[in-house]
Design a protein with these regions (language model features):
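Bacterial N-terminal signal peptides
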Residues: 11-21
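Secreted, disulfide-rich extracellular signaling modules
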Residues: 2-8, 21-410
């Protein structure tokens, strides 16, 4: 084998090893051997501004629906939107406008997250007679921006019931029985695709919580509506009663969180049910990345501030596209910081450290192609929504956050 080719291959393998070995170093590490045609550098940028803030909790796309109270959280009500076509036959709701179709009744059901009933309060169901097809937004609706008064008075009440149809497993459902007048109310001639949303709430205040499956829980029984009907074949012949099932496609719990704690506001905090997010600004103002350089990693590093063992807790991050307010902890009715989803990244906490690799956006910033307003941190929907994570901020003398960039330069 050509000696020069063999030597270059050895150099490449050595560089790979150096990248791994020096990934935890903060100082620049030039590879100065005259025989090596590339240089490996590591540079650290300080986080100079950091702040947590709160927005109304947005609980869409979580696995569960919550009612009642838990640990200071008030679960006011749940909003549920149904699919426009039935699960198996693909029957649209307009099917029931046919004069040969007689709707006998409807049953709206939610699957309880437990297989036993200890306390069985009464729930009530409302709908939206004046709403179109977009009563709520699963990703944006919350206790501040949603107007509950647009819902009807309650149209049905229900309680938990055990279903023993499956001999291998007992399931518990919350069932609401509805008569055909509800379908008639839905079928306003001015609404071609009539409203398919419901509001479910406890009839009375409860001190405990009641948890149900949402439409996002994989392999579970999400909310559904069954429409029982008969069909006339002719004036004198009518088929037996059958039904169509319509599954929920959007749902969320509207919750009011407890007051913010001192820890929530003094550390960098993230948590879905508390509505907590954080922003940080990395000082990269005077940095210009050599056009020939290739960044292998650009880790934004945070240290976990709780004495707890975590597994599979994921934090997501993006650059923000407007200036942040880093003066003090604030609460907003709406998130004021828009994200650039093109640079979305996520990672899990490992050994009490969170290392978010922003290699792509760091390259753009280093090439002076992107304005650096900072980065947002928020919790992933896959986490426990009631778990708030705390990280040390810039006032910590030993565990302050930092961005560490490793790059190779020919």
């Amino acid at each position: 084998m050509n000696f020069f080719l063999l030597k270059n291959r050895i150099i490449v393998f050595c560089l790979i090893g150096l990248i791994t070995f020096f990934s935890c170093e903060e100082a620049a590490i030039p590879v100065k051997d005259d025989g090596i045609p590339m240089k490996l550098d590591t540079i650290s940028f300080p986080v100079i501004k950091a702040m947590s803030y709160q927005v109304p909790p947005e609980m869409g796309r979580t696995d569960l629906l919550y009612f009642g109270n838990k640990d200071g959280y008030n679960f006011s009500y749940n909003l549920i939107k149904l699919d426009s076509s039935s699960v198996t036959a693909g029957t649209p709701f307009s099917f029931y406008n046919d004069s040969l179709i007689i709707v006998d009744s409807l049953k709206f059901s939610l699957r309880f997250d437990s297989d036993s009933i200890e306390n069985n309060p009464e729930f009530q169901l409302r709908y939206f007679p004046d709403g179109g097809d977009s009563v709520f937004n699963e990703l944006e609706s919350n206790y501040i921006n949603f107007d509950k008064s647009i819902a009807s008075t309650f149209i049905s009440t229900g309680q938990l019931e055990s279903d023993t149809t499956d001999t291998n497993q007992t399931k518990v459902f919350l069932n609401f029985l509805l008569d055909s007048s509800i379908v008639n109310a839905f079928k306003d001639t001015n609404i071609t695709d009539f409203n398919r949303s419901f509001l479910v709430e406890l009839k009375n205040e409860e001190s405990e919580s009641f948890i149900f499956h949402s439409s996002d829980k994989v392999g579970a029984d999400g909310p559904q509506l069954k429409v029982y009907y008969r069909q006339f074949v002719s004036d004198s012949v009518v088929l037996d009663t059958t039904f169509r099932t319509y599954a929920a496609i959007e749902d969320l719990s509207i919750i009011i969180p407890p007051p913010i704690s001192t820890d929530d506001s003094s550390y960098l905090s993230v948590g879905t049910a508390m509505g907590l997010k954080s922003i940080v600004l990395v000082d990269m103002v005077d940095w210009i990345l050599d056009p020939r350089a290739i960044i292998s990693s650009a880790e934004l590093i945070f240290n976990f501030a709780l004495d707890d063992t975590l597994q599979n807790y994921t934090v997501i991050s993006y650059p923000i596209i407007n200036e942040g307010d880093f003066l003090q902890f604030s609460s907003f009715d709406k998130d004021p910081y828009d994200e650039d989803f093109n640079y979305y990244t996520s990672t899990s906490i490992v050994e009490d450290k969170l290392k978010i690799n922003h290699r792509k956006i760091a390259t753009e910033i280093g090439h002076q192609k992107y304005n650096n307003y900072g980065f947002k941190l928020e919790t992933s929907l896959s986490n426990d929504p009631f778990r708030t994570m705390l990280f040390y901020s810039i006032d910590s003398p030993d565990y302050f956050p930092v961005m560490r960039v490793i790059y190779v330069l020919p």
